[in-house]
Design a protein with these regions (language model features):
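N-terminal pre-domain/capping segments
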Residues: 4-8, 19-120, 190, 296-308
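Acidic-and-aromatic substrate-binding clefts and catalytic sites of carbohydrate-active enzymes
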Residues: 45-51, 67-79, 97-106, 128-132, ...
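Alpha-helical scaffolding segments of alpha/beta enzyme cores, especially the outer helices
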Residues: 55-59, 79-83, 87, 108-111, ...
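Conserved beta-strand positions in the central sheet of alpha/beta enzyme cores
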Residues: 69, 94, 122, 159, ...
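Active-site acidic/histidine proton-transfer and metal-coordination neighborhood
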Residues: 99-191, 292
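Acidic/histidine-rich catalytic cores of soluble enzymes
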Residues: 153-254
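C-terminal/domain-terminus segments
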Residues: 277-304
Length: 308
């Protein structure tokens, strides 16, 4: 009996060790499953896209990106773009489309990007008169409601991509961005928080993302560097206003991990908020790097912290 008992105990011990070993081997797979897929906003490499659309997509995939967010199709046929994405293995996540284009012909915008295979259409930027405090701000809110309804009916989801000017407070004391989200239902409009501009506006990016838990399917990861206090219009200083050349300034977009952002805290908040995609964006190259080198640096950083 003692021999049998000893044998049973030995077998049990071996079984427990075996289970423990399997559990240890399973951990990396579980961690991998928990990682959010990472895309890139192709505005970051717009010159490369214009010069070689398909070739740039192939390079983006080779870097390790899972999907892309478009900023124009550069006269390529939407169905062809969809075919290229399938061939290369990139998810066509979303597209930034000027609000003016949506207002002019939302049916065409929807048809084009459904053909591309996008899940989301994004309002990327609004002109001054449609910003909080502008004469057309309230009209813009209603325009977005209408566009959101059209997108919903077509099986797409409308997102709004913020800058810093949406954090101007209205007479009520409410931020313009919060007013937009409180006045357009979540089933018609979701967030695409650009965390660079959230931080630049003086808010905590992770905390603000958590405020919109369940309504933030796509998050823009963007880093920047700032020397001292910014004075004047940041878009003039970085040369993003139409017709203006870039001026020397204290503000500079940076690859992820090279600026002021606490990127890990944003990624953790994205998990908690139920986000589905992280999207890398860098409006202008910096640090002596070319645009493609910048997005390469960003994804290598994400790999280094275990987020990719």
């Amino acid at each position: 009996m003692k021999k049998i008992s000893s044998l049973l105990m030995a077998v049990a011990a071996m079984f427990m060790v075996s289970c423990g070993g399997n559990a240890q081997k399973a951990a990396p797979a579980e961690e991998a499953a928990a990682k959010l897929p990472v895309g890139v906003q192709l505005y970051s490499v717009r010159g490369d896209m214009e010069a070689d659309f398909k070739g740039t997509l192939q390079k983006v995939k080779a870097m390790g990106y899972d999907g892309v967010e478009f900023a124009g199709l550069f006269n390529n046929d939407p169905a062809q773009v969809n075919a290229w994405c399938k061939e290369i293995g990139l998810e066509p996540i979303s597209a930034h489309v000027p609000l003016a284009d949506m207002l002019a012909d939302i049916d065409k915008v929807i048809a084009d990007y459904k053909a591309v295979g996008c899940t989301y259409i994004v309002v990327p930027y609004v002109t001054e008169e449609r910003r909080p405090g502008g004469e057309l701000f309230l009209q813009m809110v209603e325009e977005i409601r209408t566009i959101g309804q059209k997108c919903k009916e077509a099986g797409l989801t409308l997102l709004y991509h913020n800058h810093d000017f949406e954090f101007k407070k209205l007479e009520s004391g409410e931020y313009g961005l919060d007013y937009l989200y409180s006045n357009v239902p979540a089933d018609l409009l979701q967030t695409e928080l650009d965390e660079c501009w959230v931080k630049y506006s003086g808010l905590n990016p992770a905390e603000y993302l958590l405020k919109y838990s369940g309504r933030s399917p796509v998050v823009h990861l963007k880093d920047y560097h700032l020397e001292g206090e910014m004075e004047g219009d940041p878009y003039a200083l970085i040369g993003l206003n139409e017709g203006e050349e870039k001026k020397s300034s204290a503000f500079e977009f940076r690859p992820l991990g090279k600026g002021l952002q606490d990127v890990p805290s944003i990624i953790e908040a994205a998990h908690q908020a139920g986000s589905k995609w992280l999207i890398v964006e860098q409006d202008e190259p910096s640090m002596g790097l070319e645009p493609m080198q910048c997005i390469q640096t960003s994804i290598e950083y994400l790999k280094s912290i275990g987020a990719k």
